Amino acid sequence: MEPTSKKLTGRLMLAVGGAVLGSLQFGYNTGVINAPQKVIEEFYNQTWVQRYGEPIPPATLTTLWSLSVAIFSVGGMIGSFSVGLFVNRFGRRNSMLMMNLLAFVSAVLMGFSKLGKSFEMLILGRFIIGVYCGLTTGFVPMYVGEVSPTELRGALGTLHQLGIVVGILIAQVFGLDSIMGNQELWPLLLSVIFIPALLQCILLPFCPESPRFLLINRNEENRAKSVLKKLRGTADVTRDLQEMKEESRQMMREKKVTILELFRSAAYRQPILIAVVLQLSQQLSGINAVFYYSTSIFEKAGVQQPVYATIGSGIVNTAFTVVSLFVVERAGRRTLHLIGLAGMAGCAVLMTIALALLERLPWMSYLSIVAIFGFVAFFEVGPGPIPWFIVAELFSQGPRPAAIAVAGFSNWTSNFIVGMCFQYVEQLCGPYVFIIFTVLLVLFFIFTYFKVPETKGRTFDEIASGFRQGGASQSDKTPEELFHPLGADSQV
């Protein structure tokens, strides 16, 4: 291994930083709708009165608000499933650049919805930015994974999740009543997304196209070699080129991989199952339930200023993503995911106990806060960042876009289900709702322990070869048995 292969060059930092602005958009638009709920509902009511001369019926208001929140995930499902249509035709970088048009259109619709006295404009804007974010959750991990050297792929892949949590935190802070979450400024709160979109439009033209896309998809070896030299900061990129050429030869031996082929072929069935289950482990862990309803959970816990406690959880969220960034290449993906799932299960039990005993023991409110902060911290150790970039690692260049589309669709669909159902399940189960998530977390832990391989320090082709060699006959082996022959020690 050349000593320069671990080098974090300026061009590599620019490429990853430019891409991760899309992740920040995703996080911001996930969190921005919660804080100004009451003032936006008042806008809906005023608009209804102006149109029909009477206050909006409560059931209609609830439906419109639920639609405003949920339509974002519907857009995300459509966007995530469309990833392959763009990245193979236009390239990774150009696809990210083009999609900013959606962000600009959405910003205009939401920003002028109050002036236009139209809640339909706001809902349509939420749908369009949802499509943008769905595409982003495919484009960014794919691009970052393909421009990063093997030894830095996990750490740089974690930056996608860091962008998301920073976006959520910014949305929580901007959404404070004293800043933009008020009657006058909420349209600006929703439309400020044009700023990162504009910044990304400025930066991306200076970022290189994915060298893997150039060599394997376009057969432009000279361009790929030139890009690699800039990304790696060295003239000797022989190892990277050889690895890509081997992957290209393997891809030529395979027929074109469609989404259906991922499930039909024995070589892809296990990795696509792993990819989907890891995405489900992120969304069905209960983290979105905590974020969607954190303010009301803190209120039930007796916290005097719940909105600031929610921001506190956002800070914890960000801090532990940074921790994951520094340890993912040392501890490995699988280990961190297992630690995160186990820790979240323990915190979910604590949260259940605290909420159940709150009326009899007021000091349990403090335990609930500790449990929520712990839950968020363990999420960012593993289940937060790892499912995003490990999908790109599990597949070679050919099936990667289709696999990322399926995984992203699974993520957004489960996100939508949790967002729509949690409130009703919480009303039914009361403080015991997090027991459901505890059971799911334990099941995901068992699956990860027995089925998920360690990808740390391995090239894309080595990981894919492990599945090809193993096939269906290897599916019952432990991750250590499955990947032991690959000689990963030489890569670390």
From Swiss-Prot:
D-glucose binds at Q161, Q282, Q283, N288, N317, E380, W388. The chain crosses the membrane at residues 12-33, 67-87, 91-112, 121-144, 156-176, 186-206, 272-293, 307-328, 335-355, 366-388, 402-422, 430-450. GO terms for molecular function: D-glucose transmembrane transporter activity; dehydroascorbic acid transmembrane transporter activity; fucose transmembrane transporter activity; identical protein binding; long-chain fatty acid transmembrane transporter activity. Residues 34-66, 113-120, 177-185, 294-306, 356-365, 423-429 are extracellular. Detected in brain capillary (at protein level). Detected in brain capillary. Phosphorylation at Ser-226 by PKC promotes glucose uptake by increasing cell membrane localization. It comes from the Eukaryota. The modification Phosphoserine is found at S226, S465, S490. The modification Phosphothreonine is found at T478. This is Solute carrier family 2, facilitated glucose transporter member 1.
